[in-house]
Amino acid sequence: MSDVVSAEKIACEVDHAARQLAQAGRLDLTREFIQHGDVTVYTHVTSVARASLSFAERLGRVGVSVDRASLLRGALLHDYFLYDWHNPDPSHRLHGFRHPFFALARAEEDFELTPRERNIIVRHMFPLVPVPPTCREAW
């Protein structure tokens, strides 16, 4: 498969999964929050999902397999904290350290998660949060 076809396939796969999560939960709220600069959380997580699937395809070519469904959902939900962390609200202090736990709590409110998806979400800030991932999809 050419890289162009693969990139288009991945983009469609990410868009489909994002639509499913938006219908079943609150993923569309992430369009309202800025992640970094002028990039929304939604744009950030869909970009991470595309990059993750692209990397997974390359790994697959050399015999390294991943749980693609968990990788995709985990990537889309890794920043599912659902608040504007730029707001000076005291509960947003130490956002970099705490948001994986908030993201996991919000995702568990809206979705049934696999243990691997939980690990992807809560461990994605390693080494800032010093507990390493326990599955390859979370790296």
Name each model-derived stretch.
Residues 1-139:
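Metal-dependent phosphohydrolase cores
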